[in-house]
C-alpha cells in the first residue's frame, strides 16, 4: 500500500515511517525538515498535492508543535496560529479533492478551550469529521527527537542530565500525564489503518498507556538511569505550577483497546530512549 506520512521527520512520524516501511508499505515522506518545498504552509503546494493524490492512505501528523516548554513560549503567537491553520487548510482541501482515507493526529488537549493548541486541534477534528476521516488523540507520546527546541519532557530531562547534570524543571512536577512509547503509538496507528472501515469519525480513538504518572516521578526515573551509569544528576523542580494544561485532567477512552493495547512499560520505554541518547554523549 502507498502510505503518505505528513510530518515524517517529527517524533511520531519518524518512528511511523520506519515501522510502516518494515511492514512492506511504500511510504512517502513529507516534512519541511527534508526540503523547503515540503513546507505545508505554502498554498498551493504542488508537491503536497502530488503526494496526496498518489497515496492509498494518508497519516496527517504534521503540526507546528512541541513539548510544554515550546507551547508555553509560542502557542499564543501569530506565527504558531497562522502556521497551523495554513497547514490544515492546505491539507484538508487536498484530502477532500482526492477523496483519500486518512487519519488526523489530534490531542487529548483538543477540548481545552483556553489553549490555542487545543483549539487548533479541535478545528482539525471538525475538518476531519466533515470529510469522514478518522481522529486519533495522542497522550504524550515519547521517543527519540531531533529538534531539541521542540523536545518533550522525557527527552528534555535526559538531555539536561547529560549536558548540565541538573534536571531543571519548568514546573513543580505535581501535574500528571499519561505517557506512551512511540513504537506502541505506531502499532496503534497501523491498527487503525488496517481496520479503517470498523471505525467512524466520531469514535474516541485515544492512543495512550492509560497509566497516569506525575512529572516529578518521571524526573526521578530518569535520575535512576543516570545512577546506573555512575553519573550524578540532581532533580530541581520549579515553584511554578502547570500553565499549559492548567492541571486539567481528561479521562481516556479505552474504545481502541478492542483492537490494540500498548505493550511497553514506562520504565522500559524511558530506558530505550536513554540508551539511544547516551550514544550522543559517549
Where does each model-flagged region fall?
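Structured catalytic cores of enzymes that bind and process phosphorylated ligands/cofactors
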Residues: 83, 112, 143-146, 157, ...
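A general structural signal for well-ordered alpha-helical segments in protein cores
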Residues: 88, 154-155, 215, 219
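C-terminal substrate-binding subdomain of Rossmann-fold SDR/epimerase-dehydratase oxidoreductases
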Residues: 7, 161-282
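Solvent-exposed, non-membrane alpha-helical residues enriched in polar/charged side chains
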Residues: 49, 92, 129, 155-159, ...
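N-terminal Rossmann-like NAD(P)+-binding domain of SDR-like oxidoreductases, especially those catalyzing
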Residues: 1-144, 272, 276-277
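NAD(P)-dependent short-chain dehydrogenase/reductase
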Residues: 114-118, 122-191, 221-223
